[in-house]
């Protein structure tokens, strides 16, 4: 173990594991970044909903997972791109696409956390946090 913690990778692993276990929801330690990423997942239809829960500490995000009529998770792929040891950035002209635009890329930009489509609209680049399909 390297000793470097990566809260975003932990967040994504918790979502994946909860989906594999076909859970209705998962409670994840909250942060501004995770809240922003979860809001994007909600807006793009990858989760049902989420709520903030006060636990007298940092708080929790209760993320309600979404499944189709065949009990398949709405999130088919959730992949971390930029990591603490290897940051990856893209400018507005070179933003990656997921599955020819069917998926999304989540970026941390100077204007906040947003999807690749929003970043293109605003003409900004940033750190490529994750790919979702």
UniProtKB/Swiss-Prot annotation:
InterPro entries assigned to the protein according to its UniProt record, in alphabetical order: Ribosomal_uS8, Ribosomal_uS8_CS, Ribosomal_uS8_sf
GO cellular component, one term: ribosome
GO biological process, one term: translation
Function: One of the primary rRNA binding proteins, it binds directly to 16S rRNA central domain where it helps coordinate assembly of the platform of the 30S subunit.
Subunit structure: Part of the 30S ribosomal subunit. Contacts proteins S5 and S12.
Protein name: Small ribosomal subunit protein uS8
Taxonomy of the source species: Bacteria, Pseudomonadati, Rhodothermota, Rhodothermia, Rhodothermales
Keywords from the UniProt entry: Ribonucleoprotein, Ribosomal protein, RNA-binding, rRNA-binding
Domain of life per record: Bacteria
Protein's organism: Salinibacter ruber (strain DSM 13855 / M31)
Molecular functions per Gene Ontology: rRNA binding; structural constituent of ribosome
Similarity comment: Belongs to the universal ribosomal protein uS8 family.
């Amino acid at each position: 173990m390297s000793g470097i913690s990566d809260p975003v990778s932990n967040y994504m692993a918790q979502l994946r594991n909860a989906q594999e276990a076909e859970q209705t929801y998962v409670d994840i330690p909250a942060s501004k970044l995770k809240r922003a990423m979860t809001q994007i997942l909600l807006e793009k239809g990858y989760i049902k909903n989420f709520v903030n829960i006060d636990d007298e500490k940092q708080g929790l995000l209760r993320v309600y997972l979404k499944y189709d009529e065949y009990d398949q998770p709405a999130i088919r792929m959730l992949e971390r791109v930029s990591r603490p040891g290897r940051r990856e950035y893209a400018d507005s002209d070179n933003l990656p696409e997921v599955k020819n635009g069917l998926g999304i890329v989540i970026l941390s930009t100077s204007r906040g956390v947003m999807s690749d489509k929003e970043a293109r609209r605003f003409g900004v680049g940033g750190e490529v946090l994750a790919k979702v399909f």
